[in-house]
A protein has these predicted regions:
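Outer-membrane beta-barrel pore domains
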Residues: 278-291, 296-516
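Outer membrane beta-barrel
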Residues: 99-191, 211-230
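Signature for the C-terminal beta-barrel architecture of outer-membrane proteins
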Residues: 168-364, 428, 446-450
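Transmembrane beta-strand segments of Gram-negative outer membrane beta-barrel proteins
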Residues: 28-79, 90-102, 182-188
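Bacterial Sec-dependent N-terminal signal peptides
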Residues: 1-32, 516
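Short loop/turn motifs that connect adjacent beta-strands in outer-membrane beta-barrel proteins
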Residues: 28-44, 85-99, 124-128, 170-182, ...
Length: 516
């Protein structure tokens, strides 16, 4: 069913325009690890990994949220080479500096391929940044280290090539004396072509606000992510049974007029030769995102971060008719400790994900089918992986025996199986991070999920996935080793134990420490 995205976008975009008009704004992007590089020069990273599993497939927590770099088929070898350069002084807020990077990952298995998760050039000035290319990103208010995955953009798929202007972190507004800080971005991108879709583009923007000075013990966060797929061509749409309804001879609107409607999705565009019937009664493109809120509390020797991400794909989501669909989380983080204990617990995270409401069961405003769109036949995916939460699954990734016995999982639109079909779920996720022997990092993840068949039947599918990862096992100098074990059991991904051994070397090709 083509998504229904109506005039409630007006309120969102009024807020965005008011905030983006402030000169000190720019990009919002929350990366898995914050960029703290303060050394000019060129650094490198080289890795070799070997992976195996008991059933020949990658366990859930071996492949998920890895930016599409871990293959599905095991055994496999994975080789990674990355180079990052910094020219200039990041500490001098009033002078621009240049950053560039590239990372190439090779998968050697029964379906060998090369992956390019990063390739970018960025110019930065203070909190602001303009970049062209791909960068590893996670969007939204979430604990990036131990999360199950941000609901709309999780770091699960290979990054999308973009041109982006924005901030790298929260930029304080001077006239508020640091009370209010803003993190925002605006970008245009290009999806990789698939068998089904060609020349599809990305529109993305976000605005987030922090209320509270950095020294305060309590700070509030709120904001919105808005993403849209638009433009492109599909032969399947041109030849399909409802082709005239869904496209103009296979083409989806890509003109300047269409772009304005994507950026400012208010009302319908009206009749035009480039618009199909569905375009004239709906919003142009596939719109989705999340409305986030967070609370950061500083304790005596620790901190708490509470956060929520409310998913939306149309008017019903923007008006919270699908509440409580989304993600809810809490993170406990230990303060600085000089303890010499063998085991130092650094962080705990717990999350709850639910998509059971779906705005009800009645059409036209209910039955939200997350990450599906009638015109964009691959759904909210990129290079074969879901862009949002990996808790949802693609039809192509499910066992064929499961698809044969479930009308829900094998449902179709215009005689095609839905690309993302397993999206009615409740999950509990926990994560822990500790330091062992004052140098070895240990990360434990566990996710229990129950998948439903919405109103098709009372059948449910339970799933448990776990992983333990050890890194910084020093071998010699700049060479260290990592070990990861992951296990799946349940009705979706049956019993599977996998292991990954990684040898990593890092260092500088050139190095020039910068002055404060």
């Amino acid at each position: 069913m083509v998504k229904r995205q109506q005039s409630l976008f007006r309120a969102i975009h009024l807020v965005c325009i008011q905030l983006v008009g402030i000169p000190s704004l720019a990009q919002f992007q929350n990366r898995p690890t914050y960029d703290t590089t303060m050394t000019a020069g060129i650094r490198y990273r080289a890795e070799l990994s070997g992976v195996v599993s008991t059933n020949g497939r990658s366990p859930f927590w071996m492949r998920s949220n890895q930016f599409g770099t871990v293959p599905w088929q095991f055994p496999a070898g994975i080789g990674t080479v990355g180079v990052t350069g910094l020219w200039g002084n990041p500490r001098q807020a009033h002078k621009p500096y240049l950053k560039a990077g590239i990372e190439v990952v090779g998968n050697l298995n029964s379906a060998s391929r090369l992956v390019l998760p990063e390739a970018y050039v960025a110019v930065r000035l203070g909190h602001g940044e303009l970049y062209i290319g791909r960068q590893k990103e996670i969007h939204g208010l979430v604990d990036t280290l131990l999360t199950s995955g941000s609901i709309a953009w999780s770091g699960n798929a290979v990054p999308i090539t973009q041109i982006r202007l924005g901030t790298r972190d929260f930029a304080p507004l001077k006239f508020t004396k640091g009370l209010i800080a803003v993190n925002a971005f605006f970008s245009h991108g290009w999806f990789s072509d698939t068998d089904s879709m060609h020349n599809v583009m990305l529109h993305a923007k976000a605005v987030f606000v922090r209320v509270g000075k950095p020294t305060w013990k309590v700070r509030f966060y709120g904001g919105i992510n808005h993403f849209a797929q638009w433009g492109g061509y599909s032969k399947a749409l041109a030849d399909g049974p409802v082709s005239k309804f869904l496209s103009a001879n296979g083409y989806l609107p890509s003109s300047l007029k269409a772009y304005k409607s994507v950026v400012w999705p208010i009302g319908q565009p009206g009749s035009d030769d480039q618009f199909s019937a569905i375009d004239t009664i709906n919003q142009i493109g596939n719109h989705l995102g999340s409305i986030d809120a967070g609370l950061d509390i500083q304790l005596k020797n620790a901190s708490l971060f509470l956060y929520s991400q409310h998913i939306f794909e149309d008017n019903s989501g923007l008006t919270f008719k699908n509440f409580p669909d989304g993600l809810f989380g809490v993170r406990w983080k230990a303060g600085v400790s000089n303890s010499g204990a063998v085991v130092q617990l650094k962080q705990l995270t717990a999350e709850f994900i639910t998509t059971r409401n779906r705005s009800g069961t009645k059409l036209p405003y209910g039955r939200d089918d997350y990450f599906f769109h009638g015109q964009y036949l691959d759904g909210w995916t990129h290079q074969g992986a879901i862009i949002g939460t990996p808790i949802f699954t693609r039809t192509a990734d499910l066992p064929s025996a499961l698809l044969k016995k479930s009308a829900w999982l094998s449902r179709s639109f215009a005689y095609r199986l839905l690309p993302v079909n397993n999206n009615d779920v409740q999950s509990v996720h926990v994560g822990a991070y500790a330091v062992l022997f004052q140098r070895v990092s240990a990360v434990l993840l566990a996710t229990g999920s129950r998948y439903y068949e919405f109103d098709y039947s009372a059948r449910t599918y339970d799933q448990l996935s776990m992983s333990l990862e050890l890194t910084n096992l020093v071998l010699s100098g700049s060479v260290n080793m990592g070990l990861k074990l992951a296990y799946d059991t349940g009705a979706i991904f049956t019993g599977n134990l996998g292991g990954m051994l990684t040898i990593r070397k890092t260092g500088f090709l050139t190095q020039k420490p910068v002055n404060r």
